[in-house]
From Swiss-Prot:
Keywords recorded for this protein, A-Z: Methyltransferase, S-adenosyl-L-methionine, Transferase
Any single GO BP term: methylation
InterPro entries: Bact_Chemotaxis_MeTrfase, Chemotaxis_MeTrfase_CheR, CheR_C, CheR_MeTrfase, CheR_N, CheR_N_sf, SAM-dependent_MTases_sf
Catalysed reaction equations from the record: L-glutamyl-[protein] + S-adenosyl-L-methionine = [protein]-L-glutamate 5-O-methyl ester + S-adenosyl-L-homocysteine
Descriptive protein name: Chemotaxis protein methyltransferase 3
Function as written in the Swiss-Prot or TrEMBL entry: Methylation of the membrane-bound methyl-accepting chemotaxis proteins (MCP) to form gamma-glutamyl methyl ester residues in MCP.
Length: 276
């Protein structure tokens, strides 16, 4: 049995500095020194499975093997989400944006859930669009849902969740947009396939090139930028601005803002920003 403060694996200061450098260089994520215990805890589980004793052995793997690199990044990324998280954003979509789109009789709508994790955010969005009747007046709707972590994307693409997840979903959406699992899926629930078809899930590193060929009507990037340093955040905000249509909307997490890029947007409150 290990004594208190005794570590099972060696993680030197040099090792941790490498991890900080690697995560920032590769995916833009800033890991402050205060995250060292978290990093050690997550990596130690992986090292135990691989039969490694020192992080230098792990480093050799991620430097030589692309799949190991991806798995390493997945291990250190945080994926906390739920249906209708920060519900005021979805109320704004249904009560403000949808009436505007309907009045303008838009024929095409493009959305992006950036940092979609296990899929609750894009599925919430499509549920709101369906409940508000957007599909009745707009024939061409597409939601791109992206994340860095390939493991969470695999789960998201299935659209299957424990029945306990319904606790955060208002009843009117739950009845209309989800079905309960039966037989081997008993105890689970699933987004209806008729809604799932509007969503495309893809792996994407936010600090690399984006694949979009069209300007977007709405970007949801909530509680993602908190993991980036200030220069990276500002670069992303500028790129979001360029990717949005004039009048397009950017929604950020409750503790995030556009910072020094405020001249690019009109702030409507509650971390809702309209492209100038």
């Amino acid at each position: 049995m290990l004594a208190v403060n005794e570590q099972e694996f060696e993680l030197t200061d040099k090792d941790f500095k490498f991890i900080q450098w690697f995560m920032h260089k590769t995916v833009g994520i800033y890991l402050p020194d205060s995250k060292r215990t978290m990093v050690y805890g997550r990596l130690s589980r992986q090292m135990r499975r691989k039969g490694l004793r020192r992080f230098t052995q792990f480093r050799e793997l991620i430097e030589s093997d692309e799949q190991e690199r991806i798995h390493f990044i997945n291990t250190l990324t945080t994926n906390k989400t739920e249906f209708f998280r920060e519900s005021h954003h979805f109320e704004f979509i249904e009560k403000v944006l949808v009436p505007e789109w309907s009045k303008e009789r838009v024929g095409q709508l493009r959305f992006w859930s950036a940092g979609c994790s296990t899929g609750e955010e894009p599925y919430t969005l499509v549920s709101v669009l369906d409940h508000a009747g957007v599909m009745n007046f707009c024939p061409d709707i597409k939601i791109w849902a992206t994340d860095l972590d390939t493991a969470v994307l695999e789960k998201a693409s299935l659209g299957i969740y424990p029945i306990e997840s319904q606790s955060s979903i208002p009843e009117r959406y739950l009845r209309r947009c989800f079905v309960r699992g039966v037989k081997d899926q008993q105890g689970n629930m699933k987004i209806k396939q008729s809604l799932q078809r509007y969503i495309d899930f893809h792996q994407l590193n936010l600090i690399q090139e984006w694949p979009f060929k069209q300007k977007l009507d709405l970007i949801l990037c909530r509680n993602v930028m908190i993991y980036f340093d200030r220069p990276t955040q500002e670069q992303l905000i500028e790129r979001f601005h360029q990717q949005l249509k004039p009048g397009g909307v950017l929604m950020l997490g409750h503790s995030e803002s556009v910072g020094r890029c405020s001249s690019l947007f009109h702030h409507l409150g509650h971390t809702v920003y309209v492209r100038q």
